[in-house]
Structure formats: structure tokens, C-alpha cells
Amino acid sequence: ILRPLDLMKPYRLEMGTKLETAQGKNLYEFWGDKIQKNVLDELKNQKSDLLINLASKEYFSVLGKVPEDINVISPAFKDYKNGKYKIISFYAKKARGLMARWIIQNKVTDFENLKDFDVDGYKYSKAESTSTTPVFLRKQS
């Protein structure tokens, strides 16, 4: 049984972790351009120029500058609270995971179909969205 004052060891490496290796002083330097190359190779293999970013800003930044011919779509999830819609990180993280599952289950391959996401009360908002940031709103959380 875990008690309130029990110590817990870290169970994953955060991207911001300082970790000195021969490749650099943190995980960004350790990975270098390997992750970007892998993602771009996968897009090429899929014959796609669409990259749906469901990562946090911290993790997505490991890709570095994405080539201009890649269409990066970064959905935003907003919940209604205190009279307005705003991003609540806890719910947004969960929504990104829900969308990832939904994309796989529905075999979504284009931006238009992404707008059909309607899981857990989120609905696409044309008025709030841009060409690279589709916004999904939810009244109840």
C-alpha cells in the first residue's frame, strides 16, 4: 500500500531531464535529429504530408523545425469553465490521447475527417479553429 509520505522513484524520463552523455547534456541533444528523421521517413513511407501533433509542446519540440512541405495540425481542446472556454491541461492531455485512439480506430488520414472527432463531449468549432489548429470545445468536464 502506498502511503502519502512514501518516496516514489521516477518511472519515466521527461524531455527536460538533465542527462549528460557523450551525445549531449540533455535528451534533446541525445536524440538530435534521429526522431525527426524517423518521423519524416514514416510520412514518406505512408505517402503523406500530414502530421497530426498530439504531443505536448515539450515533446513535439524534439522534432525541431519541421520542413515546410509537411502540414502540421495541432488540435487544441478547450473546456468551459467560469464563463469561458480555456485549455485545462489535465483535460487536454486526456483529450489528445482520446483523439489518438479515435484516429487509429477510424483510420483518419486527412484534416477534414479530423473535424468529425466527437469523443467525451468535444465538438469541432469552426469559429475558433485555424487551418493548423482545429479547436474542439466541451461544455462539461
Each model region followed by its residue ranges:
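Internal, well-folded beta-alpha domain core
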Residues: 1-129, 135, 139-141
